[in-house]
Curated annotation (Swiss-Prot):
Protein name: Arginine--tRNA ligase
Catalytic function, reaction form: tRNA(Arg) + L-arginine + ATP = L-arginyl-tRNA(Arg) + AMP + diphosphate
Domain of life: Bacteria
Family: Belongs to the class-I aminoacyl-tRNA synthetase family.
CDD domains from the UniProt entry: ArgRS_core (cd00671)
Pfam families attached to this UniProt entry: Arg_tRNA_synt_N, DALR_1, tRNA-synt_1d
Protein's UniProt keywords contain Plastid: no
């Protein structure tokens, strides 16, 4: 019985006793002290007002039913209505065998199996290298995808290429100016990468500078962003991020055989549903009806489309591809997107409440390096490839996933390079390497297997480790439910800390070899615990795209 099974049992008990569904409010937590039991339940306090009954009476009734469950050893009730559960020794230590039997599958579940999710992240403009904030979105977005897939979801990783608009034009003009060795246009893009792109285009088209401006700029406009996207793709792959779809904004503007673009069709849908109106020669969508601070323009008076028009078409494109959930990671400076995307969900599905899609916009804070923000426009970009070369993939992915995305991060390159226990990624990876070292030592000594006796695991550090192994499934389920990979990282740090403490307190393999049968049984039992911890460390590290080194 895992935590989710225990929650279901509590839900069933309450339903049978009170004909009340408590599935949305039931939660189990670890008690503040081990002697209080394995799990604490405060549900009676929540039910008291709902059921118009004293919390202590509800607690007593639930406790009596819990005692009948397999694996529950004792149940304690404390005023004003708390319940503490103690599971049987055999039940708690059974998690070790479960981990070893399931191996890399341990922790997988089907809690998200009903969902087909489009996860859009990074989506940096193809006007320069990905910077530190993009690196953070890459680490977090890909980890969210891994966690959701682990929980049974069908996930598409998607990158939206913003290859339409003034910034693309300005970028093309900047590359063209570099090719001609001329000064940049006003608000142009500086940086060596612009010169590199110019040189590459000149190699592809040796006579391009002899062409007229009109002919040359067409080539520069197309190839500049394409070359930059090629570099972005290489950087993402090096960072262990593989997008399933690279979606071009340009495709939303392209007409079909009837002369209608995807944007045209999206706006027609808005008009059909009664949300498109004209004002001062421009067209707007009534997004204020769904909490937006103002109605959004989609077609200017000069007949050019706005970015929001493309956003509407892109949303409809995703829906037409059959996604049930849309998750979008953007920077905190895009906070206005939340209401706009929620408005789309209502506008395009006005005919059916059930067909409205779950749209989640995750807002991420900036990353600072030496207290300096990065800007392509200022030419002080530290690109993804550069930071990977300096720090490494593992430290970056671990560090960026370590914090909630709405928390600003200061990146200390030197700290992340340290091979010491105050560097979290080293601390966790070293724990895994230690588990592998013990296994190699045991194999080298040709220790005979004497069986597994979990009742021998009585040291307080062993009890702590077993409890943490038991928590893993719930951590993963919650990380998927709330789209929060930092839950996995913090769990990894807790498990690694408990393992190092156990390693230091308990002698797993005697220095002078096994002396007798009873000692051999304890050694082998501890080796099984060691293997289980190593497996869970490996599984959890994989969820955030961080390697598990055999040696360090």
């Amino acid at each position: 019985m895992n935590v989710e099974d225990l929650k279901k049992s509590v839900t069933n008990i309450v339903h049978s006793m009170y004909n009340f569904d408590c599935s949305e409010i039931v939660s189990l937590t670890r008690p503040p002290k081990p002697e209080y039991g394995d799990w604490a339940l405060s549900l009676p306090l929540k039910l008291a007002s709902l059921l118009k009954s004293p919390a202590i009476d509800i607690a007593q009734s639930i406790a009596s039913a819990l005692l009948e469950l397999d694996g529950v050893q004792d149940v304690y009730v404390a005023k004003p209505g708390f319940i503490n559960l103690k599971l049987s020794r055999e039940h708690t230590t059974g998690i070790i065998s479960e981990v070893l039997e399931q191996g890399s599958s341990f922790g997988r579940n089907t809690t998200q199996s009903s969902k087909k999710i489009n996860l859009e992240f990074v989506s940096g403009n193809p006007t320069g290298p990905l910077h530190l904030a993009h690196t953070r979105w890459a680490a977090v977005g890909d980890s969210i995808a891994r966690i959701l897939i682990n929980c049974g979801a069908d996930v598409t990783r998607e990158y939206y290429i913003n290859n339409v608009g003034n910034q693309i034009h300005l970028f093309s003009e900047s590359v063209y100016a570099r090719a001609l060795s001329k000064s940049l246009p006003k608000d142009g893009y500086p940086g060596e990468y612009v010169k590199d792109i110019a040189r590459r285009i000149q190699c592809e088209f040796p006579n391009i500078i002899d062409l007229s401006y009109e002919d040359a700029i067409k080539i520069f406009r197309k190839r500049s962003w394409q070359i930059q996207i090629e570099e972005i793709k290489k950087s993402c792959i090096a960072f262990r991020v593989n997008f399933d779809v690279w979606f071009s904004e340009e495709s939303l503007h392209e007409p079909d055989r009837f002369g209608k673009s995807q944007i045209d069709k999206a706006l027609a849908r808005c008009k059909q549903n009664g949300y498109l109106f004209q004002k001062n020669g421009a067209f707007f969508i009534r997004t204020t009806e769904f909490g937006d601070d103002k109605d959004r323009a989609v077609l200017r008076s000069d007949t050019s489309y706005t970015y929001y028009a493309a956003d509407c078409a892109y949303y409809l494109n995703k829906i037409n591809r059959g996604f049930s959930d849309l998750v979008i990671l953007v920077g905190a400076d895009h906070h206005g997107y939340v209401k706009r995307f929620q408005a789309m969900s209502n506008i395009f599905h006005v005919d059916s409440e059930n067909n409205r899609k779950n749209v989640q916009v995750l807002l991420g804070q900036m990353v600072l390096l030496k207290n300096k923000r990065q800007s392509k426009r200022e030419g002080n970009v530290i690109g993804l490839s550069e930071i990977i070369q300096s720090v490494g993939v593992d430290p970056l992915r671990f560090w960026f996933c370590r914090y909630p995305i709405d928390t600003p991060i200061d990146l200390d390159e030197q700290h992340l390079k340290k091979r010491s226990n105050d560097n979290p990624v080293y601390y966790v990876q070293y724990a895994y390497a230690r588990t592998r070292s013990l296994i190699r030592s045991a194999n080298l000594l040709q220790m005979e297997k004497f069986g597994f006796f979990p009742e021998l695991l009585v040291h307080e550090t062993e009890t702590a480790l077993v409890s943490l192994l038991y928590d893993y499934k719930t951590v993963v389920i919650d990380a998927a439910r709330f789209l929060q990979p930092h839950r996995v990282v913090r769990y990894l740090e807790s498990l690694a800390g408990a393992y190092h403490k156990w390693y230091d307190k308990c002698r797993i393999i005697p220095r002078k070899g096994i002396l007798d049968k009873s000692e051999a049984e304890l050694v082998n039992t501890r080796l099984e615990l060691n293997r289980a911890v190593g497996q869970v460390l490996y599984n959890a590290l994989d969820l955030i795209g961080v390697s598990a080194p055999e040696r360090m």
